[in-house]
Amino acid sequence: MLIKVKTLTGKEIEIDIEPTDKVERIKERVEEKEGIPPQQQRLIYSGKQMNDEKTAADYKILGGSVLHLVLALRGGGGLRQ
């Protein structure tokens, strides 16, 4: 089934997934298309952050559903003087 992943810039990435695919696999597909490592991705669906170990079916994702991609950038160590 085709779903869309929307980035913060408004870009929509179309991805073909199976209901049995884990969120981890969806992140791998985003990496294939956008080059963003899965560990930097946070996927949001229905206002909730998705767990890597759950499947698309667990979240009741259907064809045409839109997931939101937020980047989790590693924090630095405070302000430098």
Curated annotation (Swiss-Prot):
Expression sites by tissue: Highly expressed in heart, skeletal muscle, spleen, thymus, prostate, testis, ovary, colon and leukocytes.
Residue numbers of (Microbial infection) Deamidated glutamine PTMs: 40
Post-translational modification comment from the UniProt entry: Cleavage of precursor form by UCHL3 or SENP8 is necessary for function.
Keywords of the record: Acetylation, Isopeptide bond, Nucleus, Ubl conjugation pathway
Paired cysteines (S-S): none
Annotated localization: Nucleus
Propeptide: 77-81
Positions in coiled-coil regions: none
Record site: Interaction with UBE1C: 8, 44
SMART domains to which the protein is assigned, alphabetical: UBQ
Consequence when changing residue 40 to E: Impaired ability to activate cullin-RING-based E3 ubiquitin-protein ligase complexes
Family: Belongs to the ubiquitin family.
Subunit structure: Interacts with AHR; interaction is direct. Interacts with NUB1; interaction is direct. Interacts with ESR1.
Protein name: Ubiquitin-like protein NEDD8
Species of provenance: Homo sapiens (Human)
Gene: NEDD8
